[in-house]
């Protein structure tokens, strides 16, 4: 396995080009890996980031099979980027997913996938040659309201998540219900019978991520 390369070796060099008169710093492209410096501000309540803190590290897998280690990282659901804190200040370095296959954080795998003509961040739970089971993340900006009954004096970022199945490259949003899962998978009557027997014998619940992974693993084996 190739050694992990520390991105911060060239992050430090790129930081030398900081423009103190602007909130956005100059972009760069290093070995096909692009990013931009910017000064993060929070003009609204809530956050566009997936994680509550910046304590996690990430292993970035490029399409060309190179790997990079990024420290103090978070995932920006609004910009569809992964961002790294350079110091304890609010300054961050923002990376696009261009040329990136996946990002691993705390043994979780994230991919940027096109859905409904826009890029969206997905956590991949299961994958084989035909099927992927994932959770998709999205953030929406809810405008402030002057109505005192609404109790929303400021704009607010609200994060949502949904489950998805990809079957033969067709990505579908689903609810964790057996009928909907079976329909999305396009199962034959024979496969449905086998899966029903498997569910009954193992007492798994299709409302749990880990049990759906077990079901799909079994389906791939028959």
Cite the ranges covered by each PLM segment.
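Compositionally biased P/S/T/G-rich terminal and signal peptide-adjacent segments
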Residues: 173, 177-191
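Aromatic-patch recognition
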Residues: 49-52, 56-178
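Sec-dependent signal peptide cleavage junction
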Residues: 17-47
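Short hydrophobic/aromatic-rich motifs at helix boundaries and adjacent loops
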Residues: 28-31, 166-169, 184
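Bacterial Sec-dependent N-terminal signal peptides
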Residues: 1-21, 215
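Long, compositionally biased interface segments
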Residues: 185-222
């Amino acid at each position: 396995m190739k050694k992990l390369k520390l991105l911060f070796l060239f992050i430090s060099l790129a930081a030398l080009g900081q423009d103190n008169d602007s909130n956005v710093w100059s972009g760069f492209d290093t070995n096909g890996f692009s990013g931009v410096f910017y000064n993060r501000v929070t003009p609204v309540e809530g956050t566009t980031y997936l994680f509550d803190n910046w304590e996690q590290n990430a292993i970035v897998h490029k399409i060309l099979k190179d790997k990079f280690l990024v420290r103090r990282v978070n995932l920006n659901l609004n910009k569809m980027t992964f961002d790294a804190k350079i110091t304890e200040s609010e300054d961050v370095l923002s990376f696009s997913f261009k040329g990136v296959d996946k990002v691993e954080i705390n043994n979780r795998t994230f991919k940027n996938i096109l859905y409904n003509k826009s890029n969206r961040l997905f956590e991949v739970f299961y994958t084989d040659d035909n099927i992927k089971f994932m959770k998709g993340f999205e953030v929406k900006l809810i405008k402030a309201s002057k109505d005192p009954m609404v109790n929303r004096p400021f704009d607010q970022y609200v994060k949502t998540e949904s489950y998805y199945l990809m079957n033969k490259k067709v990505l579908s949003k689903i609810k964790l219900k057996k009928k909907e899962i079976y329909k999305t998978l396009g199962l034959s009557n024979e496969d449905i019978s086998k899966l029903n027997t498997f569910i009954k014998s193992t007492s798994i619940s299709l409302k749990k991520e880990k049990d759906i992974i077990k079901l799909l693993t079994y389906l791939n084996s028959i």
